[in-house]
Amino acid sequence: MNLRHISTAFLCVTVITPVSRAETPVGDMLTKATTSDGRYISWQEHIIDDPIIAGFALSGSDGLVVGDIDQDGFDDIVSVHESDTLYDSSTHDADFTPPPEGHVRIAFGSADPDIWTNITIAEGTDAPAPEDAAIADVNGDGFPDVMVATELSHLIYLQNPGQQSRTAEWPRLILPMTQGKGSYIRVFFADLDSDGRPEAIASNKGAQRPGPKDYAVSTPVSIYRVTGDPLDGDSWQETDIGYYSVPQNSEPIDIDGDGDLDIIVGSRGEQRIAYFENMGGDKIRLEERAIGIVGARVDGFNMVYSDINGDGLLDIIGPTSKGLGWIAQPQRKGDAWNFHLIGTISPDLAVGLEIADINSDGHIDILVGSYSLGERGDDKNINKHGALGRIAWFENPNDVTQTWTRHDISRRKRGMFDKFIARDLDRDGDMDFLSTRGNSAPYDGVIWLEQIRSEKPQAAFQRARKIDSPEMPLVD
């Protein structure tokens, strides 16, 4: 509350003016979210990696993937950090050449979710502006290897040294057919031909910060198949499967439910998505299928998949031109996919998302994070009306065609939350989330959000740092 003191020689009056909920910083608001048994849900932020832990100016934290890298039974995190604090990697500038900087980091997990061992496995010209990573056992030695998509140049394969994964240098190969050929934004591993060895699938958007000339040129989504030693450039074969204006996704998912992995592609320039149907067999045969959407446009950068309406078909969930929504797969192949609104976090820009049953009611909910615009290293010129760094979740209404309830968690002046991964990290029976945080130096890095359940409402968000980019209220 605000206290205003008014006094005269005869009278002293204290006037109490309540602070409106609209002016309360989001993270400080008492949570209204509850579990299925009536307990209140709030969140505690924990730091896994940041500039202090790294010992250098770690920034531009972007994609992350999870797997047991050292085979000790605990999940580890591979994260990429774009080092783009001094320039806006989302804005075209033909007169500026970004420096070839960036880091690929691993946080090795333990039995305690607050104890991690962090190392760098690639940096600089090996990993210039890394955007995404994928993990799979490519060489068949039982240890997951890493592929990284870098926006300033290429794909790089990093081979796990096995028992020495925490201490030894990781052998590497820049895939020769990708070097200097564009800007790689997404990469995935999948065994498309069921031969027991994964292929890499990547989208080349042509330029890190595409301008009009880049949008006018179609660049490929490609499959990279390896036969032989993956550290030998001659062992890799590239097959382009389609060309698009700024393709920004190439995700393997069995979208048609026939038991093999298809590939979803997304085009920023064309504002559309499509998929390549895997025709099966011992050779990779793919046929492109349109995804015609009624009610919204989708560019397909970040999407998740679930049978939202319970009809036995996977639906697509993601940011659209109308807000966060889900797109219902039709019963008949070739028919239109229909858009259904979940909600918006306007004026903030939704980018990262994950699905999980957050409130333990048996239904899938959706966690979403935004992409803050404006300065990345300073808070002073940012106000509540801009696109800020928000985290929120949407509660499933059971009837998914109805309104989803939005529960805001945090809204800081700066923060990009590009990806979330659901995990019960503290093994207490509720869902927590891993994430990266960018656009907010010196607070970038890797975090986890612990779900807290209490009998009485608490502040929605407990920050890990005393000093951070300030929490902001919602816009009226």
Describe each model-derived feature in a short phrase.
Residues 1-7:
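Bacterial N-terminal signal peptides that target proteins for export
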Residues 7-17:
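Bacterial N-terminal signal peptides
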Residues 22-476:
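Beta-propeller-forming repeat regions
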